[in-house]
């Protein structure tokens, strides 16, 4: 499974 980078909520 390819882990996707967690996006930081603004």
From Swiss-Prot:
It is a single-pass membrane protein. The keyword Membrane applies. One of its GO terms (biological process) is oxidative phosphorylation. Liver and heart specific isoform. Pathway: Energy metabolism; oxidative phosphorylation. Component of the cytochrome c oxidase, the last enzyme in the mitochondrial electron transport chain which drives oxidative phosphorylation. The respiratory chain contains 3 multisubunit complexes succinate dehydrogenase (complex II, CII), ubiquinol-cytochrome c oxidoreductase (cytochrome b-c1 complex, complex III, CIII) and cytochrome c oxidase (complex IV, CIV), that cooperate to transfer electrons derived from NADH and succinate to molecular oxygen, creating an electrochemical gradient over the inner membrane that drives transmembrane transport and the ATP synthase. This is Cytochrome c oxidase subunit 8B, mitochondrial.
